[in-house]
């Protein structure tokens, strides 16, 4: 994928997305499938399209995405982050608007590890006074 493609890497939770954009008619392909087939939830589709709609480029680019790891929400967030970075690679003047919307910042929240002696990361056994 060399030539007139712009590239961006996005990450969210344990998902990693590699995003390639080029001038086109608005087709988005994720792991070889159309976006509406890959993401089943409407919220995931909305999350992915946010940077394109904010910059009025929804019908301007063809986008190819390779995404792995995580679940549906994490992958959608990773794709959004990757699209944002690819748009900035294409046109740096879009960065202030995307930054203001919070799409440029990587969401650094990760799953907290489970601790020994607890049920989950923080959930302890029920305390009984008597």
Swiss-Prot record:
User: Which family is this sequence assigned to?
Assistant: Belongs to the universal ribosomal protein uS9 family.
The alphabetized UniProt keywords are: Ribonucleoprotein, Ribosomal protein
- Do you know which PROSITE patterns this protein is assigned to? RIBOSOMAL_S9 (PS00360)
Task: From the record, give the cysteines joined by S-S bonds.
Answer: none
Domain of life from the UniProt record: Bacteria
**Example GO molecular function term?**
structural constituent of ribosome
Specify the species. Burkholderia pseudomallei (strain K96243)
One GO BP annotation is: translation
InterPro entries membership:
Ribosomal_Su5_D2-typ_SF (IPR020568), Ribosomal_uS9 (IPR000754), Ribosomal_uS9_bac/plastid (IPR023035), Ribosomal_uS9_CS (IPR020574), Ribsml_uS5_D2-typ_fold_subgr (IPR014721)
GO CC, sorted alphabetically, is: cytosolic small ribosomal subunit
Q: Name one Pfam family in it.
A: Ribosomal_S9
Name this protein carries in UniProt: Small ribosomal subunit protein uS9
Q: Which segment of the chain is annotated as a signal peptide?
A: none
Q: Which SUPFAM superfamilies match?
A: Ribosomal protein S5 domain 2-like
């Amino acid at each position: 994928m060399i030539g007139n493609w712009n590239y961006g890497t996005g990450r969210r939770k344990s998902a990693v997305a590699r995003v390639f954009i080029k001038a086109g008619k608005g087709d988005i392909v994720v792991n070889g499938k159309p976006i509406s087939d890959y993401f089943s939830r409407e919220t995931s589709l909305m999350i992915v399209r946010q940077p394109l709609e904010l910059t009025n480029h929804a019908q301007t680019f063809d986008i190819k995405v390779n995404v792995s790891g995580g679940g549906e929400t994490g992958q959608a967030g990773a794709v959004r982050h990757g699209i944002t970075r690819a748009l900035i690679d294409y046109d740096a003047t879009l960065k202030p608007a995307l930054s203001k919307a919070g799409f440029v910042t990587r969401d650094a929240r990760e799953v907290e590890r489970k601790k020994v002696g607890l049920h989950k990361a923080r959930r302890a056994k029920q305390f009984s006074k008597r």
